[in-house]
Amino acid sequence: DMNDVVIYYSSTVVKDKSSNALVRTTTTFTPMNDGATYTNGFGFQLDYVGKEHIDLVQVSQEGNVIGKNFEPGIEKPVLILFSDIKPVLKKPVTVVIGFKKYDKVSDMDAYPPYNSFIFVNKRSHEVHLSGYKPTSVADESLRGTGSDLSQDSNGTPMYYIAEDNMPFAINISNSEFRWPSEKVSITTYYPEFKQWRDSFGADYKDWYLHPKE
């Protein structure tokens, strides 16, 4: 039904005028729905920017700074924003990340939505946006279990896609997205979703603007 976790986000990107290098990103994440009975946390990883390129990390909520550090013990920068989404529904969290002036970080390397993911009951049980790799602390033994498609017919690794090409998680550019009710299939609520899915995103790219009335 694609409603277990719904998070809205908006981002502001600041670039250096002379070099066009990325200076700072400010992103606000707002959990809007948690339709699952289990506990869902949320975080994101910067896949292409090392910690050595970052000189500022600040997480704030309601004007109060609640965090300044990446998750320890992981080589890549990972921020965990919520360990349980239910208590923080509709409570925005703002993340500011500053980049070192002379490192010339590309905005394509550090542009939202990042490698966002939820984790279900356990930190190691990650669910990422389809096509994104898990973090180094994810339980790799879960790959290929249940309906998970761990590789295509040519042996190419696949990430967070089911055997029927159903994505485990999606990112869309619509702040007015209407998610289906519990136990209502997204293919029923959004009739064009199936064609979009079956075409691997080539057709019906605005499916999310056309819910069933």
Regions found by a protein language model. Name each.
Residues 1-213:
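Extracellular distal adhesion/interaction modules in secreted or cell-surface proteins
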